[in-house]
Amino acid sequence: VWDGDVASMHPHSAIFECIFGPEYTRRFQDIVDARVAIKHKDFDAAGLMLNGALRPYLNEEQAADLAQALKIVINSIYGLTSASFENPFRDPRNIDNIVAKRGALFMTLLKQQVQALGYTVAHIKTDSIKIPDATQYIMDFIIKFGNEYGYKFETEANFEKYCLVNDAVYVGKFKDGKHAGEWTATGTQFQVPY
């Protein structure tokens, strides 16, 4: 089972919709781009972003923590766009969370397109799609389709074995990568040892 994941879906939806206006959306995009560069250990690119402010912290020891800190900032800003209270990021015209809606509509359309090509969609959530027996053709199709809407798909995992319990809980055995042969559980049902 191939697990394709959209990198920073909601932030990229906010960027594509220019939700903060041109100037502030560009600044928001700089933070998102810096996080992605750090996550992929591209310290040279990250060092050029945000006027070099992150350069002193760009090393193997601090990379994961820095990427996580930027993720918190990004998600906080995104969350404030649809908060019920007044704040500088909230637009009162955004009554139905346009950022989340854009992503949800995209994933619905993607599911329909993948199924129309004859593939099974085992699981689809906010920013990921899982396809059993995925071929290179369908993976390339999904990546290209995502690019057309401003989304970048990455391979989150390839599972040798996969058990979907419900819409939010699954257990899988990694097929390859640094965790090859290991099992993972998503959802508290299988993570509590008693």
Language-model segment annotations:
Residues V1-Y194:
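Conserved acidic
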